[in-house]
Swiss-Prot record:
Quaternary structure and partners: Monomer.
Annotated tissue distribution: Expressed in leaves, stems, panicles and seeds. Expressed in root tissues and lamina joints.
Organism of origin: Oryza sativa subsp. japonica
Active site: 128 (proton acceptor)
Protein name as annotated: Casein kinase 1
Function (record text): Casein kinases are operationally defined by their preferential utilization of acidic proteins such as caseins as substrates. Can phosphorylate casein in vitro. Required for normal root development through modulation of cell elongation. Plants silencing CKI1 show abnormal root development, with reduced number of lateral and adventitious roots, and shortened primary roots as a result of reduced cell elongation. May be involved in abscisic acid (ABA) and brassinosteroid (BR) signaling pathways. Plays an important role in the adaptive growth and fitness under low temperature (LT) conditions.
Amino acid sequence: MEHVIGGKFKLGRKIGSGSFGELYLGVNIQSSEEVAIKLESVKSRHPQLHYESKLYMLLQGGTGIPHLKWFGVEGEYNVMVIDLLGPSLEDLFNYCNRKFSLKTVLMLADQMINRVEYMHTRGFLHRDIKPDNFLMGLGRKASQVYVIDYGLAKKYRDLQTHKHIPYRENKNLTGTARYASVNTHLGVEQSRRDDLESLGYVLMYFLRGSLPWQGLKAGTKKQKYDKISEKKMLTPVEVLCKSYPTEFISYFHYCRSLRFEDKPDYSYLKRLFRDLFIREGYQLDYIFDWTKQGSESNRLRSSGRTSGLVGPSAERTERAAARQDVPDRFSGTVDPFARRTGSGSGHYGEHTKHRNILDSLLAPKTAVDLDKRRPTSSSRNGSTSRKALLSSSRPSSGDPIDPNRSNLIPTSSGSSRPSTMQRLHQSTGLETRSSLTKTARNVHDDPTLRTFERLSISADRRK
């Protein structure tokens, strides 16, 4: 018996599950377009699909925001139908032997900052910035980064009055500890600065292969978070970014200099990385590391030398939790590409398991319109091997509250509140030096820089 959602979407095979419910492949019976269908029981103790669907509706129209196609109740389930997307950056990171080149990181950084900025302009914080929550598109959108998983997103200001949420302390850690900002560890209410600091950790994770606070052992989750927090605060950004371009140091210094209600200068941050991209002599061709890996895999397969690249069946199964060595993660993730209970878990030998599935998705070279307003619908040249990678996070019911967090650092209202840099100096005695000198060159004066804002090939014009 065929199940049709909303009279329009045929429910296909199950491709994932998580704490939020179940994820299915679907197809629009009118257009044959493949979609992703999320199901959540109406009896769920902590329903979030309705909230997430509202966020999708509020964010519709932004580049890199999946298109919400339908939401409603079918029988005993809340159902959300959205775009079918490709692999996450965590999957691609594993596929590329857990290291990204500087070129790939800079191309990703530009798009990722744009995605965070867009959410902020719509009045929301993401609050769970991590590689799993950034996905690549499929087909004509294969070079476009999408941001997903709005389960922890929070409205930080009123769009009409622009009134900002109040400063608070003693907040539980919300998000993923590995990428959480220093202020989040200290129990401070999150604001725009924290999303950007988290993004900085993601970028360094891609460049370095790991972060200094990974793999710390502790008896309890609270002790684990405390160890991560301590290590993070005791690691100067100069050490974190050692042997990498100083622009990454400047990025962190800037993010940590922001006060609670400050509006970040997103253009400055993008310009840091764009100028570095040009100075390194890179071409904005959207050939990522995995694009080259995919081309090499295809070449080897054609010559019959594929033994080292072929992984197991593409069908998703849950990896046993026995080797889950990263308890700093507490968001449920659906991942049909990787056999794991939590992606980004540091299983360094597992990257080859992703190759055969990812190879089928990665085109040798694809350029798309990344910065034009995305249309209300997108076409796909459907392949039955395509999969969805959609995740859903919710705060843990057991999030630890540090009893020593109250009045960690006395603050006053308004602009006199300390920045993260000042907090670090007060808390650890670390010396920090400012490197916030802004480049004088205007992005609009350089034709190469302008290509970051509009690509020469529009996906919507391609047939």
